């Protein structure tokens, strides 16, 4: 199938692509080993590795889906699911550049920040105008920006601690 998106592992260990068929395909670059990650109800349109490369965080379900890239990688391991937004489809994800925190945007316009270890959720924006279509942290991690399909944009200043 055709590729919808691509993400590189931060240490250069792997490359992962989102496919037309609601799957992810990855390759370990050292040996070319093929990895398939499936089970999504819809196409994955957004994915990002955590800063340390331990997790691949993805949209495409009503929760935030994370695949482990420790040890031998995601094959044979179930994904970890982080909380969602009341059944709304996760449309965008972004990984914090210095902390183990994921930002996730949803089809209902909500933006959540989720601590990977504790699973604590911080609502950033709830039910704004349309699905979240853009989401990014600033390079220093002190701001989070988002945009919706209806043209709303937002930028939130985050505490430095």
Where are these regions (language model features)?
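WD40-repeat beta-propeller superdomains and closely related acidic/aromatic-rich repeat-like regions
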Residues: 1-161
């Amino acid at each position: 199938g055709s590729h919808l998106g691509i993400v590189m592992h931060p240490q250069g260990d792997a490359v992962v692509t989102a496919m037309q068929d609601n799957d992810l395909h990855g390759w370990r670059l050292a040996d070319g080993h093929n990895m398939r990650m499936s089970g999504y109800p819809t196409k994955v349109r957004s994915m990002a590795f955590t800063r340390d490369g331990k997790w691949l965080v993805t949209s495409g379900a009503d929760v935030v889906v994370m695949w482990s890239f420790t040890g031998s990688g995601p094959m044979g391991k179930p994904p970890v699911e982080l909380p969602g937004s009341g059944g709304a489809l996760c449309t965008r994800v972004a990984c914090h550049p210095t902390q183990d925190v994921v930002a996730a945007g949803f089809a209902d316009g909500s933006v959540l920040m989720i601590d990977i270890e504790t699973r604590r959720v911080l609502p950033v924006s709830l039910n704004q105008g349309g699905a979240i279509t853009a989401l990014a942290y600033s390079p220093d991690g002190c701001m989070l920006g988002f945009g919706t399909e209806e043209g709303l944009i937002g930028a939130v200043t985050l505490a430095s601690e």
